[in-house]
Amino acid sequence: QRPVAGGRGKDAVIVSATNDVNFDGSYRYSFETSDGQRASQEGALKQVSAPGPDGDTLGEAVRGDFSYTDDAGNQFAIQYTADENGYVPQGAHLPTPPPIPEAIQKALAYIASQPQARS
């Protein structure tokens, strides 16, 4: 367990921080607090395949991570991406869907192998 200098939660202080914003729209930031919270993120503008509601074809591609320790001493860490596919977090403590049963996998493979019906 890390020693806590500056307290936990609302008493925590920022012990390191970076923030870089570039003219091309890319950026990077990170910080760490005295109670062990950490976060970092970087992003850049990206050409997207479909225009948004305002007709813009530029979007952001972001990736980052954050971690913290709860009051019980459990450590949590999340890595994520966010882009035209949405927010996609990953972490050992996050629930995952159950595996697809074999019979359903076979049925889906069969359906995919069939020619498309024309209307």
UniProtKB/Swiss-Prot annotation:
Disordered, as annotated region: 33-55
GO cellular component: chitin-based extracellular matrix
Domain Chitin-binding type R&R: from-to ranges: 24-98
Keyword set includes Secreted: no
Entry GO MF terms: structural constituent of chitin-based larval cuticle
Keyword terms of this UniProt record: Cuticle, Glycoprotein, Pyrrolidone carboxylic acid
Residue numbers carrying Pyrrolidone carboxylic acid: 1
Residues linked to a glycan: 96
Entry keyword annotation includes Glycoprotein: yes
Parts of the chain that traverse the membrane: none
Function: Component of the abdominal endocuticle.
Entry-linked PANTHER family: CUTICLE PROTEIN (PTHR10380), CUTICULAR PROTEIN 49AF, ISOFORM A (PTHR10380:SF229)
Protein name: Endocuticle structural glycoprotein SgAbd-3
Organism of this sequence: Schistocerca gregaria (Desert locust)
